[in-house]
């Protein structure tokens, strides 16, 4: 079954208890700090620190806590009221954050040509192709020329079987079944964005069910050819970081 905006509202806005503020999803790395410094930051280090950052679907602030130290101003946008309210309380002492509740696909509250870097981690994996298409169209409007984005999204649609009209592999992590790395690049092309990097990974299993896509609103004299990496050993990266975390934790 494909998750809808209503499904995401029900799950993350009402059903899920968020007792650990989302840190429970960092256990494979040994904790959120190890996830951030071992996996996320090395992949975005070319783009931060910077001026204005937008985080899409921050949840309860798992990545937000690090982004606030890497920018002059941070916008956070989430579909769920409870997520935004939690972030407001958690980051009460940070005066350079603006909070927005959206409809799950629009960024109309963000000004044109105002954002240097966009990040979304471990959230849009549950959003179907039409949502990613909308967010990339909006990204083209709000990014400054030369601005960049890093979005973690589903690739499980790669395993769609047209004969059976089903995904041929088990979708144990509730990934959006219409989304693929190929579609992400097509959406970038349509929005006049350059998709510069795509790392297709195995998240919590053996299949290449996820993708990290890096894109830019390039200046007129710059062109990027997409570089691809099929990383079927992403789980080994997580395990290595967790082993280090477990060994050195006191």
Which residues make up each language-model segment?
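Conserved acidic functional residues
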Residues: 64, 112, 122
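A short acidic, Gly/Pro-enriched loop at the edge of an enzyme's catalytic core
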Residues: 108-118
């Amino acid at each position: 079954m494909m998750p809808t905006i209503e499904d995401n509202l029900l799950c993350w806005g009402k059903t899920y208890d968020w007792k650990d503020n989302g840190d429970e999803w960092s256990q494979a790395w040994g904790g959120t700090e190890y996830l951030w410094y071992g996996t996320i930051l090395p992949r975005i280090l070319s783009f931060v620190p910077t001026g204005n950052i937008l985080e899409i679907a921050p949840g309860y602030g798992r990545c937000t806590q690090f982004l606030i130290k890497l920018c002059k101003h941070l916008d956070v946008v989430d579909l769920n009221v409870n997520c935004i309210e939690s972030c407001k309380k958690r980051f009460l002492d940070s005066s350079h954050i603006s909070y927005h509740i959206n409809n799950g696909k629009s960024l109309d509250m963000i000004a044109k040509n105002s954002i240097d870097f966009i990040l979304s981690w471990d959230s849009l994996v549950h959003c179907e192709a039409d949502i990613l298409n909308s967010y990339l169209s909006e990204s083209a409007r709000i990014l400054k020329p030369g601005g960049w984005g890093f979005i973690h999204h589903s690739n499980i649609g790669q395993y769609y079987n047209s004969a059976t009209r089903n995904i041929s592999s088990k979708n144990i992590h509730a990934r959006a079944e219409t989304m693929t790395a190929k579609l992400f690049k097509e959406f970038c092309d349509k929005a006049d964005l350059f998709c510069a990097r795509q790392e297709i990974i195995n998240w919590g299993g053996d299949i290449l069910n996820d993708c990290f896509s890096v894109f830019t609103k390039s200046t007129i004299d710059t062109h990027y050819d997409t570089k691809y990496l099929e990383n079927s050993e992403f789980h080994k990266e997580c395990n290595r970081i967790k082993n280090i975390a477990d060994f050195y934790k006191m």
